[in-house]
């Protein structure tokens, strides 16, 4: 063994030496000859001598090697003995042999592994087949067993207990019917747990009502994303808010001291704030009362409302007073205020906004924190509800409305309040306290009989310190206006050299006594009743003004006088085109007797306006691309091109630098010829782009729609009240209509065909107490047609004839145009919808659109933001930095690496029909209770908008042949365009985008080539441009249309003409332009010198 070990060590040592020498030993030693074989080599190597002269003897191997057979055949000389080879050669030969053996071994392992893998996979597949078959057999066995069991049970019951089983089933049926009958009869009464005979002590323990078993789907606090309130130090009205605390002094919530209409003072709070050992901390230091001293007077678990009666004079002890209430039937969408305590113990007033309904609660935009539960919301100095908490799914807080109990929480008579625009619960959706009016009286009688009042009746109540409390039930008549003349106010009769005094005296017509006219008109008070001595002058004014167009009559140009003329003018007469229209069209409904109902009068008006249309085709010569002539209406409008003011020309000659700034702009042509020319150019471009555009696949559209819904999810809003049920509701419509009218722009044009009645603006119908009910019936009738009539396949003229929509008036916008556009004749066209269609759109979409304006900070659409102040510019830059997830300084420095500012040329004309449909689908998915009626109304409205009749100024009607094209005068234009612009960015692959109209900022990963396939012409800005402003620094945004603004200012006004209205409008425009150019103080100073009229000029 020792000898064998020595040999092995020798071989290893020889192998190491072989690595140090060249590998040429094998051929030099003759081992590469044909006679070499491994057996001989091994024997020779073990018995021969090494090159060092060392001879190794092996007892196991013989020294004689038989002659090689190949030697005798080939005549080769016998090889040298292996002992003559070096150790390197021997080791190399052994290593070669080992390598070859290893390869053979690895090949064998691979072969066997593959064989075993196949066997294992085959076994697994076979086992899987057997398992599936066994599972199916088990399912079949269980299913058949169930049938067998049911069969045997039924057979057993039929054989032995048939009569008993029938009796049990009949009893169950009777029980269900009885329960439903009881719920139908007095289900509303079960909502309240009222006790007056026996005092109920407030005792809510954790053992009796553990928080873990609560089934409420609400959280108690939330900060609304995107809503930015104001917070100021202020005490609550009458110090009526009381802090609730635990027995150890830690904060719990809030309660409110309220005064009921029966004269009693009660404590109101959310029921979940009433916990064991809660304390009321008074406004007087050291004064507090335990809640257990109060009786639970009125409670409603459904809305978490509670009202408690306390010991005698408890409010005086705590240093608080009772606030008045506004109940659920008088709540509207309006700004409100709630109060809470700061960390330093100071009372703070927080702004909030009531936006709608959430079941039997109200949705409120407010930012609350833990511990704000129970705090009241105030409208003015009246409490409208209690803070409840928030929904887990929606982006708003919840307010508990105050139940309406006549004689207790609300009066028994009608009176005026400071409440707001429309009601939320003036329909059948909110019935907590009562179901019908007769039930209300019965329930109130029962409630009053069970209550023993320990405080003074209201008739004996007096609060000496309360100077804001009006006597309830006392109607204060409107004050009569003082006498005034027909002319302009005397303080408007002279120019002043100081701009500040000039703006103060000229701007501010609310200080004028003539505002009484408009206020009285809005309130519906007849001026002849309060100022009969003016009747003769009013009649004289009506005779000379016709339909309110008395432009040449002295005094009518004053803005306060125009409102009076429109409201009190005659419905007939006048020597203008409106008279001839009535002669052509027939009877004037304004001349009908006053005993007709508003609905009947509305039908007369519909026939009157329908008589304007002449649907016989008129040959207009050249065919218009995308539009075809389909009829005519009388020529109501006579637009004229604005002339360049002489005052502006004199300024440009006098100040050459001012002329250079305004160079390259001009006023566009006006009238039907200019409208038709521009319409052809725009339509031709639109059709060319639409041919090359490609509609994305249904899967791609669904992905983008889902992404948009996710991006706008915080703007989820409720459906209109009029369409909340299965049928159109008149009561709900009145509330929607009231809110829509309150937000109208009264000086906007009324549209076609209503201009034929003589009132050119919305004000003439809205402020007329006789026409406003007719207007509501006209809008409601159109909604009924949209809900019941099918619009599929109808042509634009058929839609108008069926009363589903009105023609869209087209006119050239009277703003400066670039000279290149003037030369081409490509003017900016405005497509203005009628007053009825405007109100229909507001009823259907106003909740969503207003919510988007309030929450612009958290959605991609930005129509709600402004750049008028430094603070607004900084806020937007900071907001944009948060969107990109960088710092504001890095954003302004490296914006080219982070975003792409883009603008779409001719965006309104590039909007396709499928884009409008997808945008409407997003709106529907963002509507909380969007039922079939709401979808049908909106889809029909969209079809009418996409297939419009265009009315030119000369009365020509052009029917739209290709659906699409956004109408610039529609109520949804700003909101819809912004969302479609974001939609296009998502199709282009942008990871984020913000947009306002056709302007957008999108992520750097967007693919601009996709826009061409969508039909858009996109231009990339070289600067950080958005909303017609270039952002230079965090606080500086420069407007890009400075030349256009100045051209409009100096060439669009004649401030030296002596007309007060012209002067007032010019000064307003001047102040606005100077404010926009505040970044260039040198230019502002020069403009102030050049553009302020001479102070010595008098008004003639």
Curated annotation (Swiss-Prot):
Gene3D superfamilies: Trypsin-like serine proteases. Precursor from which the RNA-dependent RNA polymerase (RdRp) is probably released. RNA-dependent RNA polymerase plays an essential role in virus replication (Potential). It is a multi-pass membrane protein. The keyword Cell membrane does not apply. Residues 530-542, 578-595 have a biased composition (Basic and acidic residues). The chain crosses the membrane at residues 131-151, 165-185. Belongs to the ssRNA positive-strand viruses RNA-directed RNA polymerase family. This is Protein P2-P3. One of its GO terms (biological process) is proteolysis. Residues 550-561 have a biased composition (Basic residues). The record marks 221-222, 416-417 as: Cleavage. It catalyses: RNA(n) + a ribonucleoside 5'-triphosphate = RNA(n+1) + diphosphate. Residues 463-493, 530-601 are annotated as: Disordered. Its EC number is 3.4.21.-, 2.7.7.48. It comes from the Viruses. It comes from Poinsettia latent virus (isolate Euphorbia pulcherrima/Germany/Siepen/2005). Residues 224-416 form the Peptidase S39 domain. One of its GO terms (molecular function) is serine-type endopeptidase activity.
């Amino acid at each position: 063994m020792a000898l064998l070990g020595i040999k092995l060590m020798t071989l290893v040592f020889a192998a190491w030496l072989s690595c140090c020498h060249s590998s040429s030993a094998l051929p030099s030693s003759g081992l590469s000859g044909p006679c070499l074989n491994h057996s001989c080599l091994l024997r020779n190597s073990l018995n021969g001598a090494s090159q060092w002269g060392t001879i190794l003897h092996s007892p196991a191997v013989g020294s004689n090697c038989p002659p090689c057979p190949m030697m005798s055949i080939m005549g080769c000389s016998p090889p040298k003995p292996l002992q003559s080879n070096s150790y390197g050669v021997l080791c190399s030969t052994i290593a070669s042999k080992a390598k070859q053996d290893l390869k053979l071994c690895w090949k064998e392992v691979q072969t066997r592994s593959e064989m075993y893998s196949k066997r294992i996979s085959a076994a697994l597949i076979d086992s899987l087949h057997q398992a599936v078959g066994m599972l199916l057999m088990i399912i079949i066995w269980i299913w058949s067993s169930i049938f067998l069991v049911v069969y045997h049970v039924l057979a057993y019951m039929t054989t032995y207990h048939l009569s008993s089983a029938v009796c049990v089933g009949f009893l169950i049926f009777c029980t269900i019917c009885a329960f439903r009958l009881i719920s139908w009869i007095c289900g509303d009464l079960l909502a309240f747990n009222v006790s007056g005979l026996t005092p109920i002590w407030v005792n809510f323990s954790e053992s009796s009502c553990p928080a873990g078993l609560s089934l409420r789907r609400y959280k108690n606090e939330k900060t609304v994303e995107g809503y930015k309130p104001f917070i100021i130090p202020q005490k609550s009205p009458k110090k009526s808010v009381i802090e609730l605390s635990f027995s150890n002094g830690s904060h719990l919530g809030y309660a409110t001291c309220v005064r009921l209409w029966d004269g009693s003072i009660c404590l109101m709070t959310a029921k979940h704030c009433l916990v064991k050992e809660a304390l009321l901390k008074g406004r007087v230091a050291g004064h507090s009362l335990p809640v257990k001293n109060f009786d639970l007077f009125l409670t409603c678990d459904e809305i978490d409302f509670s009202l408690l009666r306390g010991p005698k004079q408890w409010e005086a002890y705590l240093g608080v007073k009772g606030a008045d209430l506004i109940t659920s039937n008088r709540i509207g969408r309006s700004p409100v205020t709630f109060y809470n305590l700061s960390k330093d113990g100071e009372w703070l007033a927080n702004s909030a906004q009531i936006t709608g309904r959430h079941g039997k609660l109200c949705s409120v935009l407010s930012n609350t924190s833990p511990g704000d539960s129970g705090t009241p919301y105030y409208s003015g100095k009246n409490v409208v509800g209690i803070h409840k908490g928030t929904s887990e799914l929606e982006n708003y807080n919840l307010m508990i409305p105050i139940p309406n109990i006549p004689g207790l929480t609300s009066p028994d008579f009608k009176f005026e309040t400071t409440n707001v625009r429309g009601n939320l619960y003036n329909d059948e959706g909110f019935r907590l306290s009562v179901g019908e009016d007769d039930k209300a009286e019965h329930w109130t009688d029962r409630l009053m009989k069970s209550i023993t009042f320990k405080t003074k009746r209201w008739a004996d109540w007096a609060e000496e310190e309360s100077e804001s409390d009006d006597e309830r039930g006392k109607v204060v008549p409107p004050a009569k206006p003082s006498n005034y003349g027909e002319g302009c106010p005397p303080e408007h009769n002279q120019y002043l050299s100081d701009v500040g005094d000039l703006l103060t005296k000229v701007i501010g017509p609310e200080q004028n006594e003539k505002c009484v006219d408009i206020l009285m008109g809005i309130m519906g008070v007849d001026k002849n009743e309060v100022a009969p001595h003016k009747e003769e002058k009013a009649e004289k004014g009506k005779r000379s003004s016709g339909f309110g167009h008395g432009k040449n009559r002295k005094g009518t140009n004053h803005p306060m006088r125009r409102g009076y003329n429109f409201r009190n003018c005659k419905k007939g007469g006048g020597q203008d085109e409106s008279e001839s229209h009535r002669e052509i069209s027939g009877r004037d409904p304004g001349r009908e007797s006053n005993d007709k109902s508003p609905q009947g009068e509305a039908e007369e008006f519909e026939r009157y306006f329908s008589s304007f249309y002449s649907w016989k085709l008129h040959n207009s010569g050249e065919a218009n691309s995308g539009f075809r002539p389909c009829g005519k209406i009388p020529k109501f409008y006579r637009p004229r091109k604005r002339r360049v003011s002489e005052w502006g020309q004199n300024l440009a000659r006098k100040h050459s630098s001012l002329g250079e700034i305004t160079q390259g702009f001009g006023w566009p042509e006006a009238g039907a010829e200019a409208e038709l020319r521009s319409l052809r150019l725009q339509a031709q471009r639109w059709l060319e782009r639409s041919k090359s555009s490609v509609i994305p696949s249904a899967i791609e559209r669904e992905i983008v729609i889902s992404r948009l819904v996710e991006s706008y999810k915080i703007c989820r809003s409720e459906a209109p009240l009029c369409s909340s049920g299965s049928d159109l509701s008149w009561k709900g419509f009145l509330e929607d209509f009231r809110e829509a009218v309150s937000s109208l722009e009264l000086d906007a044009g009324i549209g076609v065909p209503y201009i034929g009645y003589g009132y050119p603006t919305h004000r003439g119908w809205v402020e007329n107490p006789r026409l406003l009910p007719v207007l509501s019936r006209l809008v409601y009738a159109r909604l009924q047609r949209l809900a019941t009539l099918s619009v599929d396949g109808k042509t634009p003229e058929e839609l108008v004839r069926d009363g589903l929509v009105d023609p869209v008036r087209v006119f050239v916008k009277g703003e400066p145009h670039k000279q290149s556009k003037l030369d081409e004749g490509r003017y900016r066209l405005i497509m203005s919808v009628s007053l009825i269609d405007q109100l229909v759109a507001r009823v259907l979409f106003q909740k969503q659109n207003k919510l988007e304006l309030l929450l612009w900070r958290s959605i991609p659409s930005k129509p709600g933001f402004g750049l008028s102040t430094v603070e607004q510019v900084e806020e937007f830059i900071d907001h944009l930095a948060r969107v990109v997830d960088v710092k504001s300084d890095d954003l302004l420095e490296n914006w080219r690496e982070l975003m792409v500012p883009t603008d779409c040329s001719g965006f309104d004309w590039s909007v396709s029909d499928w884009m409008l449909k997808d945008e409407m689908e997003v709106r529907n998915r963002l509507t909380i209770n969007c039922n079939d009626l709401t979808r049908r109304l909106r889809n029909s409205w969209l079809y009418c908008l996409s297939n419009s009749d265009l009315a030119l100024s000369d009365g020509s009607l052009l029917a739209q042949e290709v659906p699409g094209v956004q109408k610039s005068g529609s109520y949804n234009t700003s909101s819809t365009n912004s969302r479609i612009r974001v939609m296009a960015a998502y199709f282009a692959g942008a990871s984020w985008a913000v947009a306002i109209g056709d302007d957008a900022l999108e992520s750097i990963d967007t693919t601009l080539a996709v826009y061409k396939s969508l039909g858009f012409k996109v231009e990339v800005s070289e600067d950080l441009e958005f909303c017609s402003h270039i952002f230079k620094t965090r606080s500086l945004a420069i407007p890009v249309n400075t030349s256009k603004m100045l051209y409009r200012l100096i060439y669009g006004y004649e401030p030296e003409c002596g007309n007060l209205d012209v002067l007032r409008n010019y000064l307003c425009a001047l102040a606005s332009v100077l404010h926009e150019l505040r970044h260039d103080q040198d230019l502002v100073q020069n403009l102030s010198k050049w553009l302020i009229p001479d102070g010595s000029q008098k008004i003639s």
